[in-house]
């Protein structure tokens, strides 16, 4: 199973994971909607042709330290306009009750290595992706993230 997760924003985080091969790719797409559209025009058809499940953070606009940024809403609206099936994750679902923390990702070997992490949005996208797999009860992912203690 291949899953693509999107953490939309001015710098959009992307995580692509293949549960069979354990292939993981993380990206940052700068320049908001324009950058994401450019990225999608190149990679989107590849995702759709390869039966990739798409997961995206739903977004509730709230004012942050730098004011109100509606870039995520623009990206979500554009994705909805494509008519592509998307599984929506609320922001607070990504942690699944703190089950998918950076420490858990590191223990599972999924946290980006030093120098590979460009923005926290990559990790947020990965957390959305894994929260989706836990939600659908993908057993190998659950066991990878939370192996039973050795007896």
Regions found by a protein language model. Give the residues of each.
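Phosphate- and other anionic-substrate recognition elements at nucleic-acid/protein interfaces
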Residues: 1-151
């Amino acid at each position: 199973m291949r899953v693509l997760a999107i953490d939309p924003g001015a710098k959009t985080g992307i995580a692509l994971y293949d549960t069979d091969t354990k292939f993981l790719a993380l990206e940052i797409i700068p320049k908001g909607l324009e950058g994401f559209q450019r990225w999608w025009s190149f990679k989107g058809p590849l995702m759709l042709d390869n039966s990739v499940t798409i997961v995206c953070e739903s977004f509730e606009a709230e004012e942050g330290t730098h004011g109100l940024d509606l870039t995520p809403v623009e990206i979500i609206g554009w994705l909805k306009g494509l008519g592509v099936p998307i599984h929506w994750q609320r922001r607070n679902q990504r942690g699944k009750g703190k089950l998918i923390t950076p420490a858990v990702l590191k223990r599972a070997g999924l946290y980006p290595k030093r120098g590979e992490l460009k923005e926290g949005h990559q990790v947020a996208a990965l957390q959305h992706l894994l929260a989706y797999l836990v939600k659908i009860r993908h057993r190998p992912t659950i066991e990878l993230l939370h192996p039973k203690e050795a007896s």
